[in-house]
Design a protein with these regions (language model features):
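Conserved SGNH/GDSL esterase-like catalytic core that processes O-acyl groups on lipids
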Residues: 52, 69-70, 75, 98, ...
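N-terminal secretory signal peptides
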Residues: 1-16, 26-34
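N-terminal secretory targeting modules
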Residues: 17-27, 33, 39-223, 229-237, ...
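Surface-exposed amphipathic alpha-helices with a cationic face
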Residues: 331-338
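Active-site-proximal beta-strand/loop segments in catalytic clefts of secreted hydrolases
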Residues: 91, 159, 223-226, 265-268, ...
């Protein structure tokens, strides 16, 4: 980070006013999500916790090109924390017809579409090798023994024996995954690849049984739009701001705290209040998807919300959405999170002057919203991403070193700076 943007490692009073605001007493401990029957009995210090997750949305405009017929998908994901057992949550939540899974498998990824030798494990569903997911539903696999290391790549393979379209997927994965030639290759160490894809079809979450030590494992859920989704970050490198945060949590840790997973529920084009985008790929608004994408996350401990820019820029330029409507939406997120025992962390909206849709009226809404986020006292904590990314000489613009070129999305360095500004003592035991 530049000298003008010092890191904040703790919410000390002199610096907290610029980067971080703490409000209210600590909340009661969040209840653990009940695990499915384990391969071995979990010890009292173990807890199921999400290590990776994404936000499923609807099909892209080119859905007809994203189809599979008797093929195996090998989907690559990056674990934030480790554990001794693993289970996978698949999703047909945007589908209108049942989805049949013929076989599923998980292993440690070595490189490309290949697995580390001996790491492959078959996934079962109620003891059966396959399952059918009803339209609109998720599907959780049985747990399986697999030693997963933090910050390692996993390969989830799923054989789809029927001809299906990717009606439920996360479109902007920033990660290459693989589609096989015809047949069931779920357990094959080296997948015979027909083509690559850069999305995650029918996949929502990976959980691990984490050894928690002095405190149970918990997960941070990053809820947001394309800035959380990592737009314009380097592909196949895990350089979204939640990825950088996961690295910090592993490298720097936090005394007295159990493992902290990080799950990215950002969707490019997403809004807080309304499905403004015509494309289903932008997902349902945050208020609508909150229960599925936040509260249903295994081991949810913290909501980290950076959302609202698209509500502002998609509204009519002559009369932008009132700041009060966004504030009312934030209050709903906060109330619903706290009701379930989560701590609610809010982030200020980042600069976007230079974008074609920038107007002074829209900027005024952003400033009003940010003033409330900083000073309203409703969040348990606030991280000032606006302060971190803005150009001190032109505060309505991104700092050039953090501007990816579209004047909205950060560079890799910008995403890293965002994560560096998050005080890790936010994630103490709850």
């Amino acid at each position: 980070m530049s000298a003008q943007q010092p890191l904040v490692s703790a919410p000390e009073p002199a610096r907290a006013r610029r980067h971080f605001l703490q409000a209210g007493p600590a909340l009661a401990a969040a209840a653990l999500v009940t695990a499915t029957p384990a391969v071995r009995a979990a010890t009292p210090s173990d807890a199921w916790c999400a290590t990776w997750g994404t936000a499923p949305a609807g099909p892209p405009a080119s859905a007809s090109t994203m189809s599979f017929a008797n093929q195996t998908l090998r989907l690559i994901v990056h674990a934030s924390i480790g554990g001794s057992q693993v289970r996978v949550r698949f999703s047909n939540e945007m589908g209108s017809t049942p989805l049949r899974i013929g076989a599923a498998h998980i292993g440690l990824r070595s490189s490309g579409a290949s697995l580390v030798g001996g790491s492959g494990r078959d996934l079962t569903f109620g003891g059966r090798p396959g399952a059918t997911i009803p339209a609109g539903a998720p599907l959780l696999s049985d747990p399986v023994e697999l030693a997963v290391s933090a910050l390692s790549d996993l390969a989830i393979s799923v054989w789809l024996p029927d001809s299906v379209q990717a009606t439920t997927l996360h479109d902007m994965a920033q990660q290459t995954s693989y589609v096989s030639s015809t047949g069931n290759y779920a357990a094959t160490p080296a997948l015979p690849t027909q083509r690559t894809i850069s999305c995650w079809p029918f996949l929502a979450e990976v959980d691990v049984l984490a050894a928690s030590g002095s405190a149970p494992a918990r997960t941070v859920i990053a809820l947001g739009d394309s800035i959380t989704d990592g737009a314009r970050s380097s592909g196949n490198a895990n350089r979204r701001w939640p990825d950088w945060l996961a690295r910090r949590l592993q490298q720097e840790g936090q005394p007295g705290c159990g493992p902290v997973g990080v799950v990215n529920r950002g969707i490019c084009g997403n809004c807080l209040l309304t499905d403004y985008s015509n494309a289903l790929i932008a997902g349902h608004d945050c208020l609508e998807r909150f229960d599925r994408d936040v509260l249903a996350t295994t081991g949810a401990g913290w909501l980290f919300a950076l959302i609202g820019i698209n509500d502002i820029v998609y509204s009519p330029s002559s009369s932008p959405i009132p700041a009060e409507e966004l504030i009312a939406g934030y209050l709903q997120l906060i109330a619903r999170a706290q009701l379930r025992g989560l701590r609610a962390i809010g982030a200020t909206l980042t600069p976007f002057e230079g974008q074609a849709y920038y107007t002074p009226a829209r900027e005024a809404v952003r400033q009003r919203v940010n003033d409330w986020i900083r000073t309203g006292g409703a969040w348990n904590a606030v991280v000032d991403f606006d302060w971190v990314l803005r150009d001190p000489a032109q505060p309505t613009r991104l700092l050039p070193a953090y501007d990816s070129g579209d004047h909205l999305h950060p560079t890799d360095a910008g995403y890293q700076a965002m994560a560096q500004a998050v005080p890790l003592n936010l994630f103490t035991a709850i």
